[in-house]
A protein has these predicted regions:
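Conserved catalytic segment of ABC-fold P-loop ATPases
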Residues: 198-205
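The feature captures the beta-strand-to-loop junction immediately N-terminal to the Walker
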Residues: 44-46
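ABC ATPase "signature
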Residues: 214-215
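H-loop/switch region of ABC-family ATPase nucleotide-binding domains
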Residues: 190-191
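ABC ATPase nucleotide-binding domain signature region
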Residues: 40, 52-100
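Conserved ABC ATPase "signature" region
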Residues: 97, 109-126, 145
Length: 228
């Protein structure tokens, strides 16, 4: 097994202001996790458990408040989540080009992917309109197509398969299944057990910012379902 990501004693807290009183919310606490290259890992837990925060730390969007995050040198990573990663004044096509260049492609290589990305999104003329004019569903289509078709080494999916119309959700899941090569690492947050079962061979259950269980998909999902 080749290690792709390693989180050691990772903690994260956010400032809160409730009723005029300042305080803190502990999103993650001393979390330790290793992800190997090629892992298909599902993250489950209730709302506010820390799943989305964890993905953002993995992606480098948030620096951890404590602990360390290591990523294997040379591996590209992308987080697909509603509203993240787009420059609103650029068009969909320009955002796709920028994403490809930021992942290390030359401009010529990046341009060679733009038609396929545009066709997958089914955005039509809106592909060449500013992203600030997009609905959340249109942003989702663009983000998913860009992350998937650029062959990112580590793909982080935050409920991205649960939005959009049913036709696009089916198309996205089928495309993702075809892209699940041996070396591609996928970390998926999803509330639907069938999506987790279909894609993931390992599941991590997070509760109140800590790992409650880590193991075989069926076993962890069963334990989670039986929890009070």
């Amino acid at each position: 097994m080749t290690l792709a990501l390693k989180l050691t004693n990772v903690g994260m807290r956010f400032a809160m202001n409730s009723g005029g009183e300042k305080g803190h919310f502990q999103a993650l606490s001393e979390l330790n996790l290793e992800v190997n290259r090629g892992d298909k890992l599902g993250l489950i837990g209730g709302n506010g458990a820390g799943k989305s925060t964890l993905l953002r730390i993995m992606a480098g969007i948030y620096p951890p408040g404590s602990g360390t995050v290591w990523r294997a040198p040379g591996l590209s990573i992308a987080l697909l989540s509603l509203g993240l990663g787009f420059k609103n004044d650029l068009t969909g096509r320009e955002n796709a080009l920028l994403a490809a260049v930021l992942q290390g492609m030359t401009k010529a290589e990046a341009k060679s992917h733009l038609q396929a990305i545009g066709e997958f999104t089914e955005l039509g003329r809106f592909y060449d309109e500013p992203v600030k004019s997009y609905s959340s569903g249109m942003r989702t289509r663009l983000g998913f197509a860009t992350g998937l078709l650029l062959d990112t080494d580590i793909l982080l999916l935050d409920e991205i398969l649960a939005v959009g119309d049913q036709s696009f959700r089916n198309k996205a899941r089928e495309a993702l299944s075809q892209k699940l090569t041996k070396d591609r690492t996928v970390i998926l947050v999803h509330h639907a057990e069938n999506a987790i079962q279909e894609i993931c061979s390992r599941v991590v259950w997070i509760e109140q910012g800590t790992i409650k269980a880590d193991g075989d998909t069926a076993e962890v999902l069963e334990a989670y379902a039986k929890a009070p």
